[in-house]
């Protein structure tokens, strides 16, 4: 167990304690709201991500993926997800505050007080778990090959094996895994930087992180200048 595992446990415990204090109604509204926010964020991240890719600068990554420009596409998709999630989360917080009024009425009823507290703790634990999943997924690009993530007993399970959540983000997490494998080949000299860029594009198209149309638009905008062989990869998915 490392520091990341300890942080995860503390967040889950604190979530349950807060849920016990807040009660069932507020926590159920909270959990449903987060799930809806997640679904909408995943649904619309592609549209915003494509806009960000086209009009914001591409970065030069360091480390094993140095020179892999195409990785910027995945980076901006994650940023787009976080932007949409944050905006929707703000709306959801307003709804949670409104639900607090209903919760106060429930607490005035002695018979419902304790069950509400217990259910609130359970639901809040689940909500905390979902929030941890979102944070780990957002940090997957910088954390993936770090010792703290690799040696964590809980982080890998949460991101890659959690029922429903893992399958909903499978395209992103799987593409990151495959791209990091390409990074290892690149650092060992098994493939060139150009080949790493081309194969990364293939991964992003295969998992529908980007559409062939957007990929061609990025080429026209000179965002992927200096990379040869992209046309053949894009043609495979048109």
Cite the ranges covered by each PLM segment.
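Alpha-helical transmembrane segments and their juxtamembrane interface "caps"
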Residues: 1-238
């Amino acid at each position: 167990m490392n520091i990341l595992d300890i942080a995860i446990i503390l967040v889950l415990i604190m979530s349950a304690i807060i849920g016990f204090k807040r009660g069932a109604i507020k926590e159920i509204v909270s959990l449903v709201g987060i799930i809806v926010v997640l679904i909408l964020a995943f649904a619309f991240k592609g549209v915003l991500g494509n806009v960000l890719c086209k009009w914001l600068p591409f970065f030069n990554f360091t480390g094993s993926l140095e020179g892999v420009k195409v990785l910027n596409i995945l980076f901006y998709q994650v940023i787009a997800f976080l932007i949409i999630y944050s905006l929707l989360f703000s709306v959801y917080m307003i709804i949670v505050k409104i639900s607090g009024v209903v919760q106060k009425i429930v607490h005035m009823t002695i018979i419902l007080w304790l069950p509400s507290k217990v259910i609130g703790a359970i639901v809040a634990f689940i909500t905390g778990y979902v929030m941890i999943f979102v944070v780990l997924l957002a940090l997957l690009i910088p954390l993936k090959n770090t010792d703290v993530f690799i040696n964590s007993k809980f982080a890998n399970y949460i991101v890659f094996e959690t029922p429903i959540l893992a399958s909903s983000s499978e395209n992103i997490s799987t593409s990151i895994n495959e791209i990091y494998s390409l990074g290892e080949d690149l650092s060992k000299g098994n493939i060139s930087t150009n080949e790493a860029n081309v194969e990364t594009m293939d991964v992003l198209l295969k998992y529908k992180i980007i559409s062939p149309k957007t990929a061609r638009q990025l080429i026209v905008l000179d965002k992927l200048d200096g990379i040869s062989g992209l046309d053949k990869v894009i043609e495979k998915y048109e």
